[in-house]
Structures are given as C-alpha cells and as structure tokens.
Amino acid sequence: MTEAQKSLKRTLIGKVVSDKRQKTVTVLVERRVKHELYGKIIARSSKYHAHDEKGEYKLGDMIEITESRPLSKTKNWVASRLVQKAGLL
C-alpha cells in the first residue's frame, strides 16, 4: 500500500450524546440533504460509537471522529480531537 492510500480515512464531526460506557462515547453526526422530489432541506442524523481511550470527552462536546479498524461489534471509529467544549447550562 502506498502512503496516499493509508491516509484515506473518513473523518466526521459530531456531538457526544452519551459517555456512560468506559472508553466509548456515542456521537451524533447531523447532515443536511435536499429532498429528491420536493427540494426541501432535511436534517438527517446518524449515531456512531467511538473509542475514547482516556475518557476525556464529555456529554455535549463537539468532537472529530476518525474511521479505524473494527474495535468491537459496533465500534469502528476513534475519537481524534476536541472541536468545541460543551457549554455551561
């Protein structure tokens, strides 16, 4: 494999919606798509389980996740960096 092929990992930015499990966070990634027939912009979302080795990301944080090898049955992503800290309520 060449160096260019190794770096083709997808990255997504989303909000942490659950941090209850050890070393795992659930991230909600929202995207906007145009309805095929009516043309209205619709919000679609997906949840991903991401590996958080140090447990540093908390509920409400915006983080970037990177695709990786399968780490468990449902975990194929790794939390790579903090984009924005959760605001105080």
Swiss-Prot record:
<comment type="similarity">
    <text>Belongs to the universal ribosomal protein uS17 family.</text>
</comment>
<keyword id="KW-0694">RNA-binding</keyword>
<keyword id="KW-0689">Ribosomal protein</keyword>
<dbReference type="InterPro" id="IPR000266">
    <property type="entry name" value="Ribosomal_uS17"/>
</dbReference>
<dbReference type="GO" id="GO:0022627">
    <property type="term" value="C:cytosolic small ribosomal subunit"/>
</dbReference>
<dbReference type="GO" id="GO:0006412">
    <property type="term" value="P:translation"/>
</dbReference>
<comment type="function">
    <text>One of the primary rRNA binding proteins, it binds specifically to the 5'-end of 16S ribosomal RNA.</text>
</comment>
<dbReference type="Pfam" id="PF00366">
    <property type="entry name" value="Ribosomal_S17"/>
</dbReference>
<protein>
    <recommendedName>
        <fullName>Small ribosomal subunit protein uS17</fullName>
    </recommendedName>
</protein>
<dbReference type="GO" id="GO:0003735">
    <property type="term" value="F:structural constituent of ribosome"/>
</dbReference>
<dbReference type="InterPro" id="IPR019979">
    <property type="entry name" value="Ribosomal_uS17_CS"/>
</dbReference>
<keyword id="KW-0699">rRNA-binding</keyword>
<keyword id="KW-0687">Ribonucleoprotein</keyword>
<dbReference type="InterPro" id="IPR019984">
    <property type="entry name" value="Ribosomal_uS17_bact/chlr"/>
</dbReference>
<dbReference type="InterPro" id="IPR012340">
    <property type="entry name" value="NA-bd_OB-fold"/>
</dbReference>
<dbReference type="GO" id="GO:0019843">
    <property type="term" value="F:rRNA binding"/>
</dbReference>
<comment type="subunit">
    <text>Part of the 30S ribosomal subunit.</text>
</comment>
